[in-house]
Amino acid sequence: MAKQLAFNDAARRSLEAGIDKLANTVKVTLGPRGRNVVLDKKWGAPTITNDGVTIAREVELDDPYENLGAQLAKEVATKTNDVAGDGTTTATVLAQALVKEGLRNVAAGAAPGEIKRGIEVSVEAVAARLLENAREVEGTQVASVAAISAQSDEVGELLAEAFGKVGKDGVITIEESSTTQTELVLTEGMQFDKGYLSPYFVTDAERQEAVLEDALILINQGKISSLQDFLPLLEKALQANKPLFIIAEDIEGEALSTLIVNRIRGTLNVVAVKAPGFGDRRKAMLQDIATLTGAQVVSPDLGLTLDTVGLEVLGTARRITVTKDNTTIVDGAGTAQDVADRVAQLRAELTRTDSDWDKEKLQERLAKLAGGIGVIKVGAATEVELKEKKHRIEDAVSSTRAALEEGIVSGGGSALIHALKALDESPAVKALEGDAAAAVGIVRRALVQPLRWIAQNAGFDGFVVVAKVSELEANHGFNAKSGEYEDLIAAGVIDPVKVTRSALRNAASIAALVLTTETLVAEKPAEEEDAHAGHQH
């Protein structure tokens, strides 16, 4: 297909226009008084959300050059979501501001490479200061972090209780409830870091995950490549009329293609994953999963082979959720006594080992077996509200986990304002000269934008609020919910520092790339080609 090119300033301006369109769509959602965005869906009801990354994923622009800019801004939101799980709107607003200010300097003749270097040095200084200013999460602050992210005090309390019970490394999953109530249920379950072997296994295309309800579970220690060995068991599973979940060292060749074909045709709802761990540890982890689900590990060591076993070796679980990276098994059918015996065995091993590495791995396995899983059942009056609520609670779980990892800073955009002092004090920033030194001003002007938009969305004059907060002492800022200037940490208006730092770094990364772009290459729209084709004689 023919390509079209754009160069120099025109190229950068197109990228900026695309970033602006996406950022302007997203930034109306920022803050406690932020508005919602309605997303049209090809099937079913529209989605209403205030989650930056969900909105960003839906944006595709007509102009191919502007669309490149929008996709770059989308990358900022997606990357921030992957690392911290929240802060996607903040990241997009910061990227927009850095690009806008930076391009102004480049258009005036500044060297893009120097501007890029200045932005990177300044952002690192601010990110380091944010970490210095962070505090550990204490008591009720867990509920505050969750409540701010989900914009609901009720959800905040629920998540504080969930993390209190499963611990900061514990697994929390989110399911849809058949009632209008949102509640927390603690269940037996475990999570391990292996995802589906093929994207064809996905059952929920929007969330890119495979969900099996009331599934049979086959645990095979070796590889499965021959269909001949595997077919008898597959046919028995088909007759049982239940979904099938397979864990094996690997599944390849005709065995994998048969599973995929059956899945696509709808003959058998099946998902396959690789076994977690390596060597002897893999064997032990498979035994843990077998204990939890009431399965038997199919292994020649135990005299069991795939072609000779029946349904008696399969375990079951109420629900299994598989993403591209993780598998979560909830409510396995293993008996409480078997699980308790296995936990006791692991504890005994733990007391016998001297190796720190072994201890760490045994602790992990213990936590997975004994810790259980917190299941939040989300209820709402309508399907549209249910989806929107689920998005908010997912954000809140990620935010809370981030806060427990690296600590918290004052929220509402004020932490970035207070961290600006680092630009006056950092030796690395002071050493910058020429165009690189001019980039410090770009970062200074960009970092006030999140606060400005939080205030603006709440109906206040953003510039006035920014000027006022700049004069306040550390941890004090503007509470957009009440319209007061106060100690935000005491008021429970807090952000996980990991979220703020990820947002800042990802925004700077994309902005630096846009500023140093000279040429864009995009596909020519099909209509244009057709129009030219008609004039050939």
Swiss-Prot record:
ATP binds at T29, L30, G31, P32, D86, G87, T88, T89, T90, G412, D495. It catalyses: ATP + H2O + a folded polypeptide = ADP + phosphate + an unfolded polypeptide. Its EC number is 5.6.1.7. Signal peptide: none annotated. GO terms for molecular function: ATP binding; ATP-dependent protein folding chaperone; isomerase activity; unfolded protein binding. One of its GO terms (biological process) is protein refolding. It is found in: Cytoplasm. The keyword Magnesium does not apply. Keywords: ATP-binding, Chaperone, Cytoplasm, Isomerase, Nucleotide-binding. One of its GO terms (cellular component) is cytoplasm. PANTHER family: 60 KDA HEAT SHOCK PROTEIN, MITOCHONDRIAL. Together with its co-chaperonin GroES, plays an essential role in assisting protein folding. The GroEL-GroES system forms a nano-cage that allows encapsulation of the non-native substrate proteins and provides a physical environment optimized to promote and accelerate protein folding. Belongs to the chaperonin (HSP60) family. Forms a cylinder of 14 subunits composed of two heptameric rings stacked back-to-back. Interacts with the co-chaperonin GroES. This is Chaperonin GroEL 2. It comes from Paenarthrobacter aurescens (strain TC1). The lineage of its organism: Bacteria, Bacillati, Actinomycetota, Actinomycetes, Micrococcales. The gene is groEL2.
